[in-house]
């Protein structure tokens, strides 16, 4: 993306600036910065599975990962996109199942964003707050979650997610 730069390395957070020369430039500025310094918890840790991903930083586990990825795979037979049109088969499969649970969630969000959905909306649909038994939630919000629950299963943790597309940054807990 022209709005984001992703740095990755096997070092402690305080070593990031020493490792990447552009971060040492006093004129280098950014409105948004996110750092993740943990490792895979429910998949085997490896360099390829290490954060960062394109849209999210994730701490926790996606306990529904098998069902989520199976559902996404099943949808691929009938999925269409006004943006991708006849080129849809070039980006399948949507989910790279050799990645970590975080990477697979990032794949799903990337697909939604690249097909025209705003990232905050994609996150709210994918990782909805607990709403069904929440008596303090507004009817408007309840209707929102109920509507989208018919289209996509929640990616449930326990998880804390930080997200950004370079323009906006947000965080959710499931």
Place the predicted regions along the sequence by residue.
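Conserved short alpha-helical segments that host acidic/polar catalytic motifs at enzyme active sites
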Residues: 1-174
């Amino acid at each position: 993306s022209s709005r984001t730069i992703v740095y990755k390395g096997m070092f402690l957070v305080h070593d990031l600036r020493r490792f990447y020369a552009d971060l040492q430039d006093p004129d280098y500025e950014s409105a948004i910065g996110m750092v993740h310094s943990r490792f895979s918890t429910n998949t085997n840790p490896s360099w390829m599975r290490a954060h960062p991903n394109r849209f999210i930083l994730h701490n926790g586990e996606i306990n529904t990962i098998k069902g989520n990825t199976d559902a996404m795979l099943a949808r691929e037979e009938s999925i269409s996109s006004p943006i991708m049109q006849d080129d849809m088969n070039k980006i399948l499969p949507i989910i790279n199942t050799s990645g970590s649970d975080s990477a697979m969630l990032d794949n799903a969000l990337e697909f939604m964003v690249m097909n025209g959905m705003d990232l905050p909306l994609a996150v709210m649909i994918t990782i909805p707050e607990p709403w069904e038994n929440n008596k303090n939630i507004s009817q408007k919000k309840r209707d929102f979650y109920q509507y989208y629950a018919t289209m996509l299963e929640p990616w449930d943790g326990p998880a804390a997610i930080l997200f950004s597309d370079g323009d906006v940054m947000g965080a959710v807990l499931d």
